[in-house]
Design a protein with these regions (language model features):
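Catalytic-loop region of hydrolases
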Residues: 71, 77-106
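Lipolytic serine-hydrolase domain surface
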Residues: 239-354
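Structured beta-strand/turn binding interfaces of compact recognition modules in eukaryotic regulators
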Residues: 76, 121, 132-134, 232-235, ...
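N-terminal signal peptide
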Residues: 38-58
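A conserved cap/lid and substrate-binding interface adjacent to the catalytic center
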Residues: 97-202, 220-226, 250-251
């Protein structure tokens, strides 16, 4: 097991170097600021829509305990000290659900400050690849998020004609050492633990977008058969054709959205984007459990990726604007802090979250 530092792009692709993220940034940044301002005003000026998705018998059930296991793993990748992740001594590494995790690699790509870790979970009997989400105090990550130029899918995926993806997200995975090091870890894990293990690729926020491309990579380029993508608060990453292409190959995909989280509303559909399925909309019922945490209604949505009875229909024009809702999933705050302090935090903004 090791901590890997990466500085240089690993793959040469036309017009896809990470520094290209800074070109045309002014226009993209201005567009996103306007969009964000409009979303905030619309939400503050109106009452959130009351949306209820009725249970449908042929939809899969939602495993809450399994979901919390995945969320716990996503809290770890926000720890700043890679050595403590490597040795599994970080402040949240001793949570009961994940304390048996065996780390293979901790990956930090310095040019864009992207972080991930990989390893084996005995309790899940699975290889797990976890990608970190956006850090608000790091402008480079926000530049990636704010870049709205779509690119043709450049990896040689069969049948991907017409599939277009978010340029910043795609380049971050495909043109840096992150991709190479993750795939090297996958090979080591198979050599050590066997080739019959399930593979779980997960991430929160920006990490969910990177996890989406990683899952496709493992499926198509490396013939991984038992594969699940499990994202939390992921943005949209591609267009309608990408949605179709993705689900032609990936059958096991869960995309959890918490309440009125702003990030899954972006980039908006009017720019040509379409969410992958299957959404699980985790709604605060405004009731309280005996432990003081909210009672959640975890609604399994349809397989369209854009179920109007789920988060799509919860806010005016489909654009939600809650930052605090982006910081907690399944009643677990996604932060590298004390593992049992959920009730003690009240994050009013992204900035206050980062100070914890």
């Amino acid at each position: 097991m090791k901590v890997t530092e990466s500085y240089l792009p690993a793959i040469t692709m036309r017009n896809t170097k990470p520094r290209k993220l800074f070109e045309s940034f002014g226009l993209a940044f201005a567009n996103w600021l306007c969009l964000f301002a409009v979303a905030m005003l619309l939400t503050l000026a109106s009452t959130k829509a009351s949306v209820v998705a009725e249970a449908v018998e042929d939809r899969p059930s939602f495993d809450l305990e399994y979901g919390k296991h995945i969320v716990d793993l996503n809290t770890v990748v926000y720890c700043r000290d890679g050595n403590k992740i490597e040795t599994w001594t970080c402040p949240v590494c001793d949570k009961p659900r994940i304390k048996d995790f065996e780390v293979d690699d901790v990956i930090h790509e310095f040019e864009l400050n992207i972080m991930a870790f990989t390893g084996y979970s005995p309790s899940l009997d699975a290889f797990v690849f976890v990608f970190r989400g956006t850090k608000s105090d790091d402008l480079r990550n926000w530049i990636i998020d704010l870049s709205v130029l779509e690119l043709d899918l450049d990896l040689p995926y069969p049948g991907s004609n017409g599939a277009k993806v978010h340029g910043g997200f795609y380049r971050t995975y495909a043109t840096t050492h992150v991709r190479v090091l993750v795939l090297e870890s996958w090979a080591r894990l198979r050599a050590k633990y066997g080739t019959d293990k399930k593979v779980i690729v997960t991430g929160h926020s920006l990490g969910g977008a990177l996890a989406t491309f990683c899952a496709l990579d493992l499926k198509l380029q490396h013939n991984e058969t038992d594969l699940q993508l499990y994202t939390l608060g992921s943005p949209r990453v591609g267009n309608d054709n990408f949605f179709t292409f993705f689900h032609n190959w990936i059958g096991d995909s869960i995309r959890v959205v918490n309440n009125y989280d702003i990030v899954p509303s972006l980039p908006p559909t009017f720019l040509g984007y379409h969410h992958i399925a299957r959404e699980v909309w985790s709604v605060n019922t405004n009731k309280t459990q005996p432990d003081g945490l909210p009672v959640l209604n975890n609604i399994v949505c349809d397989d369209s990726g854009e179920d109007e009875h789920c988060s799509d229909g919860a806010c005016l024009f489909g654009i939600c604007s809650s930052i605090p809702d982006h910081m907690t999933y399944l009643n677990i705050y996604i932060t590298c802090g004390q593992p049992q302090d959920n009730k003690k935090h009240n994050f009013e903004s992204l900035e206050s979250f980062q100070k914890k």
